[in-house]
């Protein structure tokens, strides 16, 4: 702001580089990059792009809507990844083979206890906020994703 005011006061034409509180993951092309996870809550579907190529497209089950455990929308990043994790919370203690958290205790993981994904399952039988994913797709994402990869969650 000071630079802009100084430029105005000087009365001369100037080029000023803006200063940002937050910046995009990158500035060239698009801001999110070529490797990212996209999750549509309304479609109960997840896509994983790596180097611009669609690697995984899968139905998922997200947070239980009727219990108020909706998966949070926003833009996040994979915090870390872990094999053979135990997820513990109110009323559950679940082993998962592939755990990729992206926001607090919310993440992408396999859900071997489910035999179907997608549709309206999340309305009454959804997760506590995580993205339940079929085993083979969670495995493929896990084997191809790194810490810091953007995760975009939207309705």
Language-model features, listed with the residues they occupy:
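Exported/periplasmic cell-wall-interacting domains
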Residues: 70-73, 84-155
């Amino acid at each position: 702001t000071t630079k802009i005011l100084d430029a105005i006061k000087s009365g001369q034409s100037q080029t000023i580089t803006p200063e940002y509180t937050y910046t995009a993951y990158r500035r060239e092309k698009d801001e999110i990059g070529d490797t990212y996870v996209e999750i549509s809550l309304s479609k109960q579907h997840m896509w994983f792009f790596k180097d611009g190529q669609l690697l995984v497209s899968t139905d998922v089950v997200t947070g239980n809507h009727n219990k108020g455990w909706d998966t949070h929308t926003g833009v996040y990043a994979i915090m870390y990844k872990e094999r053979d994790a135990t997820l513990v919370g109110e009323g559950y203690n679940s082993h998962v083979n592939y755990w990729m958290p992206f926001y607090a205790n919310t993440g992408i993981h396999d859900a071997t206890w489910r035999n179907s994904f997608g549709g309206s399952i999340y309305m009454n039988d959804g997760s506590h906020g995580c993205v339940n994913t079929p085993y083979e797709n969670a495995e493929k994402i896990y084997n191809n994703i790194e810490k810091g990869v953007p995760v975009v969650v939207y309705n």
